[in-house]
Amino acid sequence: MQKALETKRLTLSYGETIIIDELNLEIPKGEITIFIGSNGCGKSTLLRSLARLLKPTTGDILLDNQAIQSMQTKQIARQMAILPQGPQAPEGLTVLQLVKQGRYPYQTWLKQWSEKDEEMVQNALAATGMTEFAERDVHALSGGQRQRAWIAMTLAQDTDIILLDEPTTYLDMTHQIEVLDLLFELNETEQRTIVMVLHDLNLACRYADNIVAIQDKQIYAQGKPEEVVDEKLVRDVFRMECQISTDPLFGTPLCIPHGKGRRVRKEVAHAMR
């Protein structure tokens, strides 16, 4: 397995609170890796550290076998892009202006905007279906369109690795699938390494080549969804009882949570008669 990213005995902390403790992780190159886990388990913290947005307390993070702490910022930005959760664009910024920001790592005092930069921006707009919205204000877009605009910016950055923190947050079901399908296509057609945090376990199973379940500051399980996602994992990681079935469309694990819902309401109403 070729590794795009790797951590060695990585410990991450906020103040004196340890979030991730001596974690060893390998991110496969050219695959979609999705972090899952309960709220507060450290998924987003881990993702931020991979992007060098959070300095490790101890341990190493390797990008193509080189410690990222020793690399220049622009050098990293030419190899890895990150889309944080809920990014906000300045008022009045157009889609085209936003996407152009993805070319910042390639700008210098001597080398300003080039034909290559323009080509990468136009290709990014086309790949995300945003060409027709290029002159539209980012704030005038729907949720799904706005997220596609941000993804276009990361594509314009032209990196082999894209990190995304909960890219479907605040999106309705249609736009969630739209964004995840786009990321899937980028991985399939361009072999980009995609690493993201998702809350929806069923969508994670559907789109991931590689699932990383995080619990108690460590990796609970890692591997293909069909190999690692079972009722015990859901019970241990999410503290929830469920039934694992098979997605009838994709053949991936399908988590059906235990709960009350309408059936229980009907049973209670019947018992009260």
Swiss-Prot record:
It is a peripheral membrane protein. It comes from the Bacteria. GO terms for molecular function: ATP binding; ATP hydrolysis activity. Residues 5-241 form the ABC transporter domain. Disruption phenotype: A mutant lacking fatE, fpuC and fpuD ATPases is deficient in petrobactin import in iron-depleted conditions. Keywords: ATP-binding, Cell membrane, Ion transport, Iron, Iron transport, Membrane, Nucleotide-binding, Translocase, Transport. ATP binds at G37, S38, N39, G40, C41, G42, K43, S44. Gene3D superfamilies: P-loop containing nucleotide triphosphate hydrolases. This is Petrobactin import ATP-binding protein FpuD. The lineage of its organism: Bacteria, Bacillati, Bacillota, Bacilli, Bacillales. The gene is fpuD.
